[in-house]
């Protein structure tokens, strides 16, 4: 049996082919799995569980089918969908995980994160993250009208794109990659803090398996891929793990 781990699908009505691929993945691969973990950014935008969305409705129905069949489903919020709450979780049948958290995968304690916590060289993003994850901010935000929340989210997305463009203009390609990737010292500190030898995260859209030494321990950091040009899934079992790509329909 296998545990499947994915992230960064960024499901959006403007990219129906990705939603189609995800639904096919659920039908064809999740039914026989030990568990499914979604490590954030399942959706491109999420402004509250009361947000009307045909894509979210299709996803919740598909996930519920597997939950009802007994497949454990887990969701860790990302930077795009950190407002996914208890109502949607109950409808879909998944458990919301804290970021970060340690889970046991076939006897191997494994640290799961969305991944943005490790990108501390991007100071502006970390400041925005701290503001928007504040419980008081979230409570106040969710009292606003849907239209006001949507306007804020759209503006935040435009600001994010502008920030990324600015970083590209102000830095050479090597420095830009460094700023927008994880900070090695933070990775090492996270390994040491949680006392594990394996870490899995998404966010950076740079799928890879990294081997490193932390305090004389051999550690593995697995980076999940995004679902833009193809799908990406990490398959974990008692024998190890494999990163696989999924072809988009058509």
UniProtKB/Swiss-Prot annotation:
Q: Where does Mn(2+) 2 bind?
A: 41, 79, 114, 203
Subcellular location as annotated: Cell inner membrane
- Recorded GO CC terms: cytoplasm; extrinsic component of plasma membrane
| Manganese listed as a keyword | yes
Chief location? membrane
Alphabetically, which GO biological process terms does the record hold?
lipid A biosynthetic process
Recall the GO molecular function terms of this protein's record. manganese ion binding; UDP-2,3-diacylglucosamine hydrolase activity
Q: Which Pfam families match?
A: Metallophos (PF00149)
Print the keywords alphabetically.
Cell inner membrane, Cell membrane, Hydrolase, Lipid A biosynthesis, Lipid biosynthesis, Lipid metabolism, Manganese, Membrane, Metal-binding
Enzyme Commission designation: 3.6.1.54
Enzyme class, UniProt record, top EC level? hydrolase
* NCBIfam families (alphabetical): lipid_A_lpxH, PRK05340.1
What HAMAP family does the record tag this protein with? LpxH
Described function: Hydrolyzes the pyrophosphate bond of UDP-2,3-diacylglucosamine to yield 2,3-diacylglucosamine 1-phosphate (lipid X) and UMP by catalyzing the attack of water at the alpha-P atom. Involved in the biosynthesis of lipid A, a phosphorylated glycolipid that anchors the lipopolysaccharide to the outer membrane of the cell.
Mind telling me what this protein is named? Answer: UDP-2,3-diacylglucosamine hydrolase
Encoded by which gene? lpxH
């Amino acid at each position: 049996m296998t545990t499947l781990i994915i992230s960064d699908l960024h499901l959006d009505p403007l990219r129906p082919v990705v939603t189609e691929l995800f639904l096919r993945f659920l039908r064809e691969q999740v039914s026989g799995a030990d568990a499914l973990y979604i490590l954030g950014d399942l959706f491109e935008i999420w402004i509250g569980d009361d947000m009307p969305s045909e894509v979210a409705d299709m996803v919740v129905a598909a996930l519920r089918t597997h939950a009802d069949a007994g497949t454990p489903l887990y969701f860790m919020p990302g930077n795009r969908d950190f407002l996914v709450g208890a109502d949607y979780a109950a409808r879909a049948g998944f458990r919301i995980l804290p970021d970060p958290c340690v889970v046991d995968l076939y006897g191997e304690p494994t640290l799961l994160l969305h991944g943005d916590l490790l990108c501390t060289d991007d100071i502006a993003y970390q400041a925005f993250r701290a503001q928007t994850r504040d419980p008081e901010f979230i409570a106040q935000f969710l009292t606003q009208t849907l239209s006001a929340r949507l306007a804020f989210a759209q503006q935040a997305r435009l600001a994010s794109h502008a920030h990324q463009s600015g970083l590209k203009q102000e830095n050479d390609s090597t420095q830009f990659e460094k700023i927008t990737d994880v900070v090695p010292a933070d990775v090492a500190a996270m390994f040491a803090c949680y006392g594990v030898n394996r870490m899995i995260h998404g966010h950076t859209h740079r799928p890879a398996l990294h081997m490193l030494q932390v305090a004389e321990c051999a550690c593995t950091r697995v980076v999940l891929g995004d679902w833009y040009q193809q799908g990406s899934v990490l398959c974990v079992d008692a024998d190890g793990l494999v990163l696989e790509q999924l072809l988009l329909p058509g």
